[in-house]
């Protein structure tokens, strides 16, 4: 380092310097396809979390958690001598980021300990909750993830205060870097109201999809009311909408709010100006802790978190009907907390309903409610539900237990992923149940014979590939929903989706069902094949045929064991959110969106857990297999369709072709002979992306080389197999 220099020479990634995205803001972000790699994971490639969790003494962990609840620490004293309320909030906020629109968020990855969630305003002081848990995490190490421990701590908090939970399942594996594919909103200001630039609201308070929170940095709603307006009825609209986007109906919503607010208190002892920076902005000596407060002691009775101050009911560390009793018993006056936040205090409170101070037993306070809380009384939808619960404690307790379990397990996927001795035996509709295998599975000879029958049925390569893909592509790695298992493509709503080409689908399924019935009726040893398996097998057979057409021999991997779900096991409304509005792999776009077709492709690839090379080879294969929606010619850059060749890449990168937008459709392009002007090909933005984007073009060049034919086939088969088995957690 030169003695006159201001700093040593470091790369621009260490500090400063313009990134590619800074220079070209519209550049496609492919980095989201390469998150959570082994390079960021300290556990190593061979680490098997499920195996480690099965070694865990869950009862011992729970015993330690119960002890922690009342082991108040001087550096962060427990309210009422019990940390239960804090840990319930931690678990709730870990799970509450889930949104059903894209399945992202939720408790399943332990992301609350990473940016941005660790520094969201709504997560203020939850860093203290995780630090309180650290001795237990340290004790049990790799056998319990942070993701599981945070949820378990919430359960133990409830149980230690007298509530009977519905159950607990482990199996959440931690991530080790922020989940950068999650869109939290476009605002550039924490808690920006809807009148600010880049608002998530449009029209008559229409919330942008897939967002499920009303402001940047909140989990659900603003407790003070919409944009801070203390209107309980208006707040009811926000409460219903945000909880619905997290897959909760109004009854579950009331149960969660009333049940969760039975415990603990809010903190707003003084002005927010006393509160220091969040963890990600805090100085290095803070060691990852944020929101250091200069108000009084900065803790205990002087704590500032949400700005709202007080408890909802007497006895905040005990499960009872106090919340609903107080909600309906009293009239409420609007006040401002010591921090300046809108809240409501009960009027003319009976002595029995006064709340003892959380840190000074000589003081008592009136119960408080937030504006959002009062929506449970005054909203025309939520109010009657809350009133009914107030008169039926057993129904309320059962509803809260089930809703809490759903809240904390919604993003875990099928029950086959659940681990531990406290997994509930009851099958729930929101778990997308699939029957257990109850018959002998087909073997290698059966598979070969069935493939021959399928290929002789009159169904084309493209029809078989399209149907198998349509069945499997609903899978979302975010919340582990969808996929080919269950054969729900034959059920409502999937059988009616435009992208699944209902008329063709009906024809294909009829022929496959005929083959299935004939095979099953011919067996005498209990052996059967499901339609779910046969749909996937049809795709495998078609790809093998296409490879043979190209001169390559080989077998596409196939593992039987899928089962057929029933319509009764399928919540049609819940599955509606899985409908692809865009699927670049089938060159399908339902309508023009504000998001580009290529961005939608990357998002779909991410949900399918594909890398950029996997996405690239998959697109190239699907195009030459003629597997476009509506048999569209766009992107079918080959003169020999249904033949598994690298023609897509060869012809896309041919400098003898010049591309220009088609006059009739600005989303379609024409590729014409550079010399004669004759039309050679047509393609979409998705197709041309692989010649336009420098990173994807580099990958496309690999597959366009003369010696790449066999590699292309092998790589395509590998990624096809990955997608077909994405939901086969039983194979793990």
Curated annotation (Swiss-Prot):
Its cofactor is heme b. It comes from Desulfosudis oleivorans (strain DSM 6200 / JCM 39069 / Hxd3). Heme b binds at residue 261. Gene3D superfamilies: 1.10.520.10, Peroxidase, domain 2. Residues 1-20 are annotated as: Disordered. This is Catalase-peroxidase. Formation of the three residue Trp-Tyr-Met cross-link is important for the catalase, but not the peroxidase activity of the enzyme. Its EC number is 1.11.1.21. Keywords: Heme, Hydrogen peroxide, Iron, Metal-binding, Oxidoreductase, Peroxidase. One of its GO terms (biological process) is hydrogen peroxide catabolic process. Belongs to the peroxidase family. Peroxidase/catalase subfamily. GO terms for cellular component: cytosol.
């Amino acid at each position: 380092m030169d003695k006159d220099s201001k700093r040593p020479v470091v790369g621009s990634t260490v500090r400063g310097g313009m990134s590619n995205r800074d220079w070209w803001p519209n550049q496609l972000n492919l980095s989201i396809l390469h998150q959570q790699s082994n390079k960021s994971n300290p556990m190593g490639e061979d680490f098997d979390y499920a195996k480690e969790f099965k070694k865990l003494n869950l009862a011992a962990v729970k015993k330690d958690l119960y002890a922690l609840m009342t082991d108040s620490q001087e550096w962060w004293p427990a309210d009422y001598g019990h940390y239960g309320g804090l840990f319930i909030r931690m678990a709730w906020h870990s799970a509450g980021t889930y949104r059903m629109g894209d399945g992202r968020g939720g408790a399943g990855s332990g992301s609350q300990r990473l940016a941005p969630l660790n520094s969201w305003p709504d997560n203020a002081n939850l860093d203290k909750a995780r630090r309180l848990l650290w001795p237990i995490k340290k004790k049990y190490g790799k056998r319990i993830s942070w993701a599981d421990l945070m949820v378990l701590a919430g359960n133990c908090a409830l149980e230690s205060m007298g509530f009977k939970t519905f159950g607990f399942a482990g199996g959440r594996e931690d991530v080790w870097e922020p989940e950068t594919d999650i869109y939290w909103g476009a605002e550039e200001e924490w808690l920006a109201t809807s009148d600010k630039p880049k608002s998530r609201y449009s029209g008559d308070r229409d919330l942008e999809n897939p967002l499920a929170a009303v402001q940047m940095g909140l989990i659900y709603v603003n407790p003070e009311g919409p944009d801070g307006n203390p209107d309980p009825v208006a707040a009811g609209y926000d409460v219903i909408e945000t909880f619905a986007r997290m897959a909760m109906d109004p009854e579950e919503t009331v149960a969660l709010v009333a049940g969760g607010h039975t415990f603990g208190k809010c903190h707003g002892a003084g002005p927010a100006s006393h509160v220091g920076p969040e963890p990600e902005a805090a100085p290095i000596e803070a060691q990852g802790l944020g929101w250091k407060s200069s108000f009084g002691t900065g803790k205990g009775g002087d704590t500032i978190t949400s700005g709202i101050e007080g408890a909802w009911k007497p006895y905040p560390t005990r499960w009872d009907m106090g919340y609903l009793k107080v909600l309906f018993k009293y009239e409420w006056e609007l006040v401002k907390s010591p921090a300046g936040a809108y809240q409501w205090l009960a009027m003319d409170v009976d002595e029995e309903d006064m709340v003892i101070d959380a840190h000074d037993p000589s003081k008592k306070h009136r119960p408080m409610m937030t504006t959002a809380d009062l929506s449970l009384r005054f909203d025309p939808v939520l109010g009657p539900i809350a009133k009914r619960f107030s008169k039926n404690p057993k129904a309320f307790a059962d509803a809260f237990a089930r809703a809490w379990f759903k809240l904390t397990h919604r993003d875990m996927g099928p029950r086959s992923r659940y681990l531990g001795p406290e997994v509930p035996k009851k099958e729930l509709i929101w778990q997308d149940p699939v029957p257990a295998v109850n018959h002998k599975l087909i073997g290698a000879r059966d598979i070969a014979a069935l493939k021959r029958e399928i290929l002789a049925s009159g169904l084309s390569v493209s029809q078989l590939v399209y149907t198998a893909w349509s069945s499997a592509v609903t899978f979302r790695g975010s919340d582990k929903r969808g996929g080919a298992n269950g054969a729900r493509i034959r059920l409502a709503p999937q059988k009616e989706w435009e992208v699944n080409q209902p008329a063709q689908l009906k024809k294909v399924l009829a022929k496959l069902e005929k083959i299935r019935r004939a095979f099953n009726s011919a067996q005498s040893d209990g052996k059967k094949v499901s339609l779910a398996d046969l749909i996937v097998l049809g795709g495998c057979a078609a790809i093998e045929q296409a490879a043979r057409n190209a001169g390559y021999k080989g077998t596409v991997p196939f593992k039987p064991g899928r089962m057929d779900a029933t319509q009764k096991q399928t919540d049609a409304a819940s599955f509606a959110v899985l409908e692809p509005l865009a699927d670049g792999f089938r060159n399908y776009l339902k309508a023009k969106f504000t998001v580009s077709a290529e961005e939608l492709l990357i998002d779909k690839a991410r949900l399918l857990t594909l890398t950029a090379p996997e996405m690239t080879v998959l697109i190239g294969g699907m195009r030459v297999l003629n597997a476009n929606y509506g048999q569209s010619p766009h992107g079918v850059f080959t003169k020999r369709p249904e033949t598994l060749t690298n023609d897509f890449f060869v012809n896309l990168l041919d400098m003898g072709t010049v591309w220009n937008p088609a006059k009739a459709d600005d989303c379609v392009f024409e590729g014409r002979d550079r010399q004669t002007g004759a039309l050679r090909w047509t393609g979409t933005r998705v197709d041309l992306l692989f010649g336009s984007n420098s990173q994807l073009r580099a990958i496309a060049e690999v597959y366009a080389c003369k010696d790449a034919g066999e590699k292309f086939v092998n790589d395509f088969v590998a990624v096809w197999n990955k997608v077909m088995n994405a939901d086969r957690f039983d194979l793990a």
